[in-house]
Amino acid sequence: MDFETGEHQYQYKDILSVFEDAFVDNFDCKDVQDMPKSILSKEEIDHIIMSKDAVSGTLRLFWTLLSKQEEMVQKFVEEVLRINYKFLMSPIKTEQRQPSMMTRMYIEQRDRLYNDNQVFAKYNVSRLQPYLKLRQALLELRPAKNVLIDGVLGSGKTWVALDVCLSYKVQCKMDFKIFWLNLKNCNSPETVLEMLQKLLYQIDPNWTSRSDHSSNIKLRIHSIQAELRRLLKSKPYENCLLVLLNVQNAKAWNAFNLSCKILLTTRFKQVTDFLSAATTTHISLDHHSMTLTPDEVKSLLLKYLDCRPQDLPREVLTTNPRRLSIIAESIRDGLATWDNWKHVNCDKLTTIIESSLNVLEPAEYRKMFDRLSVFPPSAHIPTILLSLIWFDVIKSDVMVVVNKLHKYSLVEKQPKESTISIPSIYLELKVKLENEYALHRSIVDHYNIPKTFDSDDLIPPYLDQYFYSHIGHHLKNIEHPERMTLFRMVFLDFRFLEQKIRHDSTAWNASGSILNTLQQLKFYKPYICDNDPKYERLVNAILDFLPKIEENLICSKYTDLLRIALMAEDEAIFEEAHKQVQRFDDRVWFTNHGRFHQHRQIINLGDNEGRHAVYLHNDFCLIALASGQILLTDVSLEGEDTYLLRDESDSSDILRMAVFNQQKHLITLHCNGSVKLWSLWPDCPGRRHSGGSKQQLVNSVVKRFIGSYANLKIVAFYLNEDAGLPEANIQLHVAFINGDVSILNWDEQDQEFKLSHVPVLKTMQSGIRCFVQVLKRYYVVCTSNCTLTVWDLTNGSSNTLELHVFNVENDTPLALDVFDERSKTATVLLIFKYSVWRLNFLPGLSVSLQSEAVQLPEGSFITCGKRSTDGRYLLLGTSEGLIVYDLKISDPVLRSNVSEHIECVDIYELFDPVYKYIVLCGAKGKQVVHVHTLRSVSGSNSHQNREIAWVHSADEISVMTKACLEPNVYLRSLMDMTRERTQLLAVDSKERIHLIKPAISRISEWSTITPTHAASNCKINAISAFNDEQIFVGYVDGVIIDVIHDTALPQQFIEEPIDYLKQVSPNILVASAHSAQKTVIFQLEKIDPLQPNDQWPLMMDVSTKYASLQEGQYIILFSDHGVCHLDIANPSAFVKPKDSEEYIVGFDLKNSLLFLAYENNIIDVFRLIFSCNQLRYEQICEEEIAQKAKISYLVATDDGTMLAMGFENGTLELFAVENRKVQLIYSIEEVHEHCIRQLLFSPCKLLLISCAEQLCFWNVTHMRNNQLEREQKRRRSRRHKQHSVTQEDAVDAAPIAADIDVDVTFVADEFHPVNRGTAELWRNKRGNAIRPELLACVKFVGNEARQFFTDAHFSHFYAIDDEGVYYHLQLLELSRLQPPPDPVTLDIANQYEDLKNLRILDSPLMQDSDSEGADVVGNLVLEKNGGVARATPILEEASS
């Protein structure tokens, strides 16, 4: 008070909030970047400018200023605002000197609230989201309406209410009349009366009771309530607000429901549930968006602790404000430290929690609540388990107790899951249970683990999410012998491991994660192994195995981990898997004799694709997502620290990013022309940080100093971390769209970029794509039209390089990279879409240019590139995979991911003698980033001077021979098999032909043939292998080579790429070029000596997709527009019907029946009639199917009674051909996700195989026995049914019963002598309960395989996917090898049986020293014997 004038003196802090609306409308919060650092710190400025709107920014500015001394606020008003905001400064100064009546009323109310709540006044931290939501609700509140704040104990309900009621806008809305009552102890009529009287005294201090104190207390309550209602409806109080804190129950609420505006807080669900949404706005502080943010956690801790922000721990496992404040108090008072606070029992917190539990009456309820501590923290506890731990005290239904606990907010219910959870603050209560072992025992017994895991289904029945997440917590608390047995039974079971992985999610909520499974295996390893070395080896093998197969598992819903493990090359994994499959002798199992595993570890991105990736120190990875967010996550498989960085006001695509300043900061260039600076490691506590992130917009820095750049976009930047200048060691060079280049210096103290004093370089070059600084003196600039310019920064002169060898017309520059800088020399890598160049700076200011021989595959192009920090290797992402290019020897030394269109790469040097680099790789259309490792290769193991090899290759331990592919070569998915099935022919990326003998799986039995024509560098486009002596290949230049004789077949008709090549008989070869609509038919040997030979080869203008020889006389050609044929005896009589208007998209020819599918989904069936030396087609039926997707493949059974069609969307449908109709039997959706490339029936009609992104084996008998009703169009998936397949609506693969009304044509044709062996193998096989029709599913490593081959018995299957991985799957017949296994008992710790006769790979201990470790795309097979005996050849089939 001014004693001379008698007036109060007010500070700027008192009246600043009065001008909130004026600041929201007129003040640009980004201008705080120009404020003196003496007013706001760098961190405070970042916190303000990151706000997503003006309201949030203004509130954060005001809250920050109000936390400072008055002199700082005065400086802000009188110095900062004076520059650009004088129109704001003047009224603030006027109001400070002579405040209005409303301002004085506001200050009076605010001071009173602060005075009544001293702890709040000292330690409150404003919480933006709850503040905004509650303030808006109060501003919209009208009389007789309510606002409710609920939350668990300690969630900060009262302080949020106080903070919002201090708002000038709220005070005005309530006419500065807010009345407060704390109803914490209002549990009786006496306390109700007391609190009503207290409220009446607040409103009318002169009020005196006229009631007789001896009268009935209810009458007195009603009397005061009536008086309060009368007062609150009067004009002075019609807008007032009544705040009811800590409402305990509905009775207390009813007593104070006085028909005015009411704000109430409660932690009791009974109050929350009682108040209707029609009258009450509900705000829950338990919602994830309302909890404390990491910045708010930090601010709260700093209120209590006298320390620097960086001294706070990064990880504080709570956001409960009350718990946080008590932790901080304990540390401040020396009762705990940051290292041991989790283990210190705080008496103050215990007292608070205990007092909150006093509501539990009778005593049995407290006992039941205490027993909940038997469950692990944060678990979602199934309510069915509660009766097990309350069995001796519960006197009513479990849900009665749950509802009571929930009523007092002591548990939280998740009705959809039928589970409850315990609020985290109650976990601080240390409870000692007398019978803890018995409680754990009862939970373990509930799941009946021995019986459950002895089930005959591939998904163990009756297990819930709780079991997969927390069963180990209970197992470790039971007695030793059984504990060890059950741990092994559960955690070594591949079915359990698979379901656990599928149920888990990543820290950023991507579905499917191995992290928690790995962590639990490591944590429970002592219980599993129990000092047994054999189990130590097995657990270690599983820990190594799971990361390698994670991609296959999460990318296919129907791939079984047990099936993958049975095909693993690790000895311990295979033996354990083989032991487990003995239980399922009626299932389909394979051993693998090819190259199945590629061992690619991944980072699962969920629904996002990765656009850019950077590997950081300490096994962190930075990934720019397609959503515009940036993921920073621990990829060590040890931790799960994750930060999601985003700019909520701009989600534009990131074009480039780079880390600097010891990886503490990030620079990003966006498609909208902005460049942003990010702080990578939030020093605020808490992991999984996902809020808006601090950024500095570099464009704004330049804009504030050079107004002409206001609307210019930045198109490129260069970061120099070794500038060596006195004022800065880090410089950022930015190029604008108009060709100007500016330089910014890094301010280490303020942690931001500031414009340097170096004049702007005006290049006048538009379309700058990338540039680098060389020798600290020159710029090398490349524009979008590939113009190279060198600028001398000392004088601003330029020199356009006239390089005659620099032929990059119609190319696109991707990146420039400078390295090997010395005093006068340096090298710049120029990476373009189709080429890579090396620009060498030489002494005397001269340059030389050389092209790098990156050897791109035909038709592919470079998408991105990254050089290793040591300058040795250049990692190139291309449209066909990764290339590791050795800059020392100028040679591509390794290939990988050849099936992928690479979008981002990074290479990180490890400084390890063995493991040299980590490689990151993201691909188009993939929601994963691959993590590869490169190891060193030296001495006798090196291959053609190659010094590195992939660690992810399965063949690191394989025997290498001359037949092995080089590390930078891979198998193409172009293959054929001889009719006798004696040899498989495959083509590699060097156009060599590999002869693989399936009967002998050793690599040493592989051989290669390189036709002479390969010297022309032409690509093989088609291959045909009739027998071991008749092998032909067709090239893109139209040349057809006889591989065995290395001669070209004479023809000049086709010069275009040979797309189809098929030898239909020992003497007839058909070749076709689709693009040219040409077909050539060769007669390999003259059949009739009397027939003239001058008419061969036959040439015709038709595009042949498939050719077939019928009756030994007629060649039938299938084309896009029809079917034509010719008679070999009379080749000139070529019958070509009129072209169809619709394309033929599928066809087959079986049992003299011709099946054609058109693009309009019309199906035609014809019978072939051979008579009088003529071939005629008799139409049997024409049907339009209901499926609207495009047909991709059609196949019929050998007898023509059924056909299957695959569609481009992955759908598969089975049809019957009967009574001159094509009728739908079964439709399968959701299994294949890609276009189906091939289908094949087994001769006995028990099996159908489909090939796309995975190889699926289908039970035809099950589909036939559960076929659609005639009027039905679809059969819905039974994915969500968990019951046994023997139940009423599913008949499995048992033989069709005689009394079923089924046409005889659908009975499996298993009694034919040729088919009997196949029927024996596949009869009575079944799938699981989710997909009973699906017998097995093998996910390819690559994106797809286009074809596969099989032997006659359908026991061996061969494929090469587009990743170059060779598969040889052999059916494992358990019933033929040994009798059915005994039921699983508790004693499962038996020794492994000797399975050497079934091993997949040779032992690693016996490998040759020639193990080079080429990438799996360049690796071959290993020996593996046993299983089903080899079968006789299968007959040729014609289908498409």
From Swiss-Prot:
Annotated SMART domains: WD40 (SM00320)
Gene Ontology terms describing biological process: apoptotic process; autophagic cell death; central nervous system formation; chaeta development; compound eye retinal cell programmed cell death; dendrite morphogenesis; melanization defense response; negative regulation of humoral immune response
Reported induction: Induced by ionizing radiation including X-ray and UV.
Domain CARD, residue spans: 14-92
Outcome, altering residue 333 to A: Prevents oligomerization through disruption of the oligomeric interface
GO MF annotations in UniProt: ADP binding; ATP binding; CARD domain binding; identical protein binding; structural molecule activity
PTM remark: May be AMPylated on Lys-251.
Region feature Disordered, mapped onto this chain: 1269-1289
Protein's name according to its UniProt entry: Apoptosome protein Dark
Taxonomic lineage from the root: Eukaryota, Metazoa, Ecdysozoa, Arthropoda, Hexapoda
